[in-house]
């Protein structure tokens, strides 16, 4: 195959030289020269890296010696029985306790027994009580009694006693005019004392009095 390619290339090269020359040019016969060139790329050198060396180390498991803990458990129990006088009834108590460093447990048990106890179911008694009737009572209010205390009438009225005596100015007994002197005698006017007069009046309780 490559020979055909070389031949075709040589023929094309020869024809190119003949066609490109001018028509007036004369060529002398040249010796036939055949050249063949083959260019091949250098082979690619593929270098594979050395395989990775994987070393698996053995797993070393070290078991430690068990650690001993000295933690004793403490337990206690208690039991008591109490009986009645005849021995028919008994009450028993039982308790137990266990304590350790990691836990604590308690248990209690109480039982009551009575050999002479007869269980009888009491009959169901239903009672119904009617409510007391409602009694309506009405109390009349006491009448309002209005009392008015009037002032007692005045039993006696004392008026001012009139003046028992009245003294008037005595008239002028003589009159002197420009006249001849005449001997005159004046006489004094005397009044007797008036009697004492008292008046009183009363009006009230349907009666009127005056004196």
From Swiss-Prot:
Region span, 4 X 9 AA tandem repeat of Y-A-A-H-A-P-V-[VA]-[AT]: 148-183
Protein's UniProt keywords contain Ubl conjugation: no
Tissue: Restricted to sternal, tergal, legs and wing anlagen epidermis, and soft cuticle secreting epidermis, such as intersegmental membranes and pleura. No expression in muscles or fat body.
Keywords from the UniProt entry: Cuticle, Repeat, Signal
Region spans: 2 X 10 AA tandem repeat of Y-A-H-A-A-P-V-V-S-[ST]: 128-147
Sequence repeats mapped onto the chain: 29-32, 41-44, 128-137, 131-134, 138-147, 141-144, 148-156, 157-165, 166-174, 175-183
Signal peptide per UniProt: 1-16
Keyword Phosphoprotein recorded: no
InterPro entries (UniProt xref): Cuticle_C1
GO molecular function terms noted in the UniProt entry: structural constituent of cuticle
Induction: By juvenile hormone.
Function: Component of the hard and soft cuticles of the larva and pupa of Tenebrio molitor.
PANTHER family to which the protein is assigned, alphabetical: LARVAL/PUPAL CUTICLE PROTEIN H1C-LIKE PROTEIN-RELATED, MIP24391P
Swiss-Prot/TrEMBL domain comment: The tetrapeptide (A-A-P-[AV]) repeats found throughout the protein are also present in many proteins constituting the protective envelope of other species.
Protein name: Larval/pupal cuticle protein H1C
Gene of this entry: LPCP-22
């Amino acid at each position: 195959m490559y020979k055909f390619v070389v031949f075709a290339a040589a023929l094309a090269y020869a024809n190119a030289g003949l066609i490109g020359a001018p028509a007036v040019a004369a060529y002398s016969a040249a010796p036939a020269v055949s050249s063949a060139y083959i260019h091949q790329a250098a082979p690619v050198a593929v270098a594979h890296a050395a395989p990775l060396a994987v070393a698996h180390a053995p797993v070393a498991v070290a078991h430690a010696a068990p650690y001993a803990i000295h933690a004793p458990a403490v337990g206690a129990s208690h039991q008591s029985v109490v009986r009645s006088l005849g021995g028919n009834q008994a009450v028993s108590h039982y308790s137990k306790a266990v304590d350790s460093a990691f836990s604590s447990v308690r248990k209690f048990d109480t039982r009551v027994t009575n050999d002479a106890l007869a269980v009888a179911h009491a009959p169901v008694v239903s009672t119904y009580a009617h409510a007391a009737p409602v009694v309506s009572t009405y109390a009349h209010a006491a009448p309002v009694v209005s009392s008015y205390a009037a002032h007692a009438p005045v039993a006696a009225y004392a008026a001012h006693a009139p003046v028992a005596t009245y003294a008037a100015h005595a008239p002028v007994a003589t009159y002197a005019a420009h006249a001849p002197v005449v001997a005159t005698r004046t006489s004094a006017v005397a009044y007797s004392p008036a009697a004492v007069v008292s008046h009183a009046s009363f009006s009230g309780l349907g009666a009127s009095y005056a004196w």
